Amino acid sequence: MNIRPLQDRVLVRRAEEEKKSAGGIILTGNAQEKPSQGEVVAVGNGKKLDNGTTLPMDVKVGDKVLFGKYSGSEVKVGDETLLMMREEDIMGIIA
């Protein structure tokens, strides 16, 4: 199944979760903190403005991005869980 985000929405694949803490302790289940970065896998056409024009997207497919801990909604695509969020929920692009 393919998903094409609409308007200013972005589909993000979350980065892999850390299996060990900074101190070397192996984390299991709920102890693992979900990373707040990922890779953009699809983008919409841009935000529709009141005057009818479309504001183009700043992010593009393949960008590594940072986002808030509670940003986006989880979406199941095949056997993978992705995040759908608005572009404004993205805090930055990792260079």
Curated annotation (Swiss-Prot):
Query: Which gene name does the record give?
Result: groES
| Family annotation (PROSITE patterns) | CHAPERONINS_CPN10 (PS00681)
What is the recorded name of this protein?
A: Co-chaperonin GroES
Localization recorded for this chain is: Cytoplasm
Principal location class: cytoplasm
Q: What does this protein do?
A: Together with the chaperonin GroEL, plays an essential role in assisting protein folding. The GroEL-GroES system forms a nano-cage that allows encapsulation of the non-native substrate proteins and provides a physical environment optimized to promote and accelerate protein folding. GroES binds to the apical surface of the GroEL ring, thereby capping the opening of the GroEL channel.
Q: Name one Pfam family in it.
A: Cpn10
Name the GO cellular-component terms.
cytoplasm
Description of how the protein assembles with itself and partners: Heptamer of 7 subunits arranged in a ring. Interacts with the chaperonin GroEL.
- Please list the disulfide bridges: none
Indicate yes or no for the key word Chaperone.
Answer: yes
The record, for SUPFAM superfamilies, names: GroES-like
Q: Which domain of life is it from?
A: Bacteria
Write the record's keywords in alphabetical order, separated by commas: Chaperone, Cytoplasm
For this protein, what is any one GO molecular function term? protein folding chaperone
Database matches in InterPro entries: Chaperonin_GroES, Chaperonin_GroES_sf, Chaprnonin_Cpn10_CS, GroES-like_sf
Has keyword S-adenosyl-L-methionine? Answer: no
Q: Name one GO biological process term.
A: chaperone cofactor-dependent protein refolding
Q: Which family does it belong to?
A: Belongs to the GroES chaperonin family.
Task: Name the CDD domains on file.
Answer: cpn10
Gene3D superfamilies membership: GroES chaperonin (2.30.33.40)
